[in-house]
Amino acid sequence: QTYAHKALTGRAYTYIDPERYGEASGFANPDESEHDLFAMGHTSTSVSLGCGLAHARDLAGDAYNVITIIGDGSLSGGLAFEGFNNAAELDSNLIIIVNDNDQSIAENHGGLYRNLAELRASNGTCERNVFRAMGLDYRYLDAGNDVLALVDALQELRDIDHPIVLHVSTAKGKGFEPAQSDPERWHHVGPFDMATGRKLCPGHPSEPAPRTYADITGEALSAAIERDPQVVGITAATPYIMGFTPELRAAAGKQFVDVGIAEEHAVTFATALARSGAKPVFGVYGTFLQRAYDELWHDLCLNDAPATILVFGASIFGTTSETHLSFFDISMLGGLPNMHYLAPACMEEYLSMLSWSLDHREHPVAIRVPGIGLVSRPDLAPAEDTDYSAVRYNVVRQGRDVAVLALGDFFELGERVANRLAAEYGIEATLVNPRYATELDREFLDSLAAEHRV
């Protein structure tokens, strides 16, 4: 939806000119264009923003249209319901377009979507209507991909004097057969072969895409689910970041739960599972975990529930939009009681921490999943019985005078720094893998300070 808006407001170049790919950010950004009213990229916000715009218009005595668009997948977010509920209180123009393609990022989940299916099947005439139940007027358009039909519908509604939902049925990926036949895989893609649809390795177009932390997460959790009926994987509409393909989700059955775009519910759901003896693992992008801060504090950590949270994408790489950056995760989780936040430096360490967290029954555990590509370092592999409940930094290389502490994704950079100090300056630095993002090994740090100058 944002891409079409950007193309129509002077930024088509970012999609059609190879020399200018990436110049525009992935989401709405007022710094790019006066036509972008808000910086936004997290879902379910549009109806609440529309309510605010409409109320401000009315306070100023103006009479323009306010039109807001929300996808059916975004309806699973709690903020969407808050917006619809308050929109019904307006007594002036507000047009809410619900773009319903019967798909979130993966498939939709939740009872709401049964009613949307009934509305589509009845051409909008079904007596049960969630939008009318919230006090909103309603229109249905079956031909949502027909531009002229959509224009006619909007012309009909443009002067309406009260809030109304225009429910349009569309096809995700319309016009590109591979995307229509596999909408989940094509929701977000990198380079691919146009003829075959095969994903390509950036910089090496003839090679298949490399394995990722998502792949090994899916493999490890699937094996754990098969061994232990108490292990439960949880996602908030992004199962692919945990490596859970449709096949793995089907095999897991009730041991894998997609709650929709509802991070708050996911955290509180995991809290109750953990307190009831289950072993929940919630995989989530760091940028979206921010939405559940109160639940992290009030539900998970205050109750000291031994759930595992896998935090993906926690850094500043891999995006051109500040809405999807995630560099507040350490400060956010570091202020919570009872929480262990681990930061592995490689695949071996990550799998060790994940395995330990499944059987750890004392406190909540979060793991900062590396994001710079799958790194295998057998030399850093922890012992099988490593207990991460006691904060102990790992000295990878003992040196003198200078100490380099390199956490998680920064470990290889720290290692290169230590190697360069040795090669160019003859300084044998101590190289440390801290492993804990928010807890200090105070005894070790005191000894380090006593024995090193820098």
List PLM regions with ranges.
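A glycine-rich helix N-cap at a beta->alpha junction
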Residues: 12-24, 88-106, 301-314, 332
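Non-catalytic terminal/interface segments that mediate subunit docking, oligomerization
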Residues: 8, 176-290, 295-305, 384-392, ...
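Cofactor-binding active-site loop characterized by glycine-rich and histidine/acidic residues
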Residues: 1-90, 231, 245-246
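Glycine-/acidic-rich phosphate or pyrophosphate-binding loops and their flanking alpha/beta elements
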Residues: 152-154, 187, 212-226, 243-250, ...
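A short, small-residue-rich loop immediately preceding and capping a beta-strand
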Residues: 39, 62-77, 94-97, 232-234, ...
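Conserved thiamine diphosphate
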Residues: 30, 55, 59-65, 110-153, ...
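Long, well-ordered, tryptophan-enriched scaffold segments
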Residues: 101-217
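Hydrophobic, small-residue-rich alpha-helical packing segments that form membrane-like cores
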Residues: 43-69, 74-130, 135, 148-161
